[in-house]
């Protein structure tokens, strides 16, 4: 079951993959915020807004039946997602020095 406020990677029925934060979910629809698509490039995978024309401050609702797979996103990708969606760069884990 999807949990509110967690970031997930979704595979949709058209084979696209998006990363988004879950706002709410039920048997018919899932509401997400800041959906980003994973786009393979020669330099590696890039995150691009999943809906270029959407108001980024608005949530997006998708039909739950169109989600074929989902998993909690790994920590490295979450850091990139947070940077792409908010501009905040998370510091690497480790002992503080200086």
Residue ranges and their predicted role:
Residues 1-98:
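Conserved RNA-binding domains used in RNP assembly and mRNA/RNA metabolism
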């Amino acid at each position: 079951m999807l949990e509110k406020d967690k970031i997930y990677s979704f595979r949709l029925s058209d084979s696209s993959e998006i990363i988004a934060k879950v706002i709410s979910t039920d048997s018919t629809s899932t509401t997400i915020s800041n959906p980003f698509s994973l786009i393979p490039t020669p330099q590696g995978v890039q995150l691009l807004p999943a809906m270029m024309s959407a108001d980024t401050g608005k949530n997006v609702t998708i039909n739950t039946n169109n989600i074929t797979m989902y998993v909690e996103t790994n920590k490295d990708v979450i850091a990139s997602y947070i940077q792409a969606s908010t501009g905040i760069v998370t510091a690497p884990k480790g002992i503080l020095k200086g």
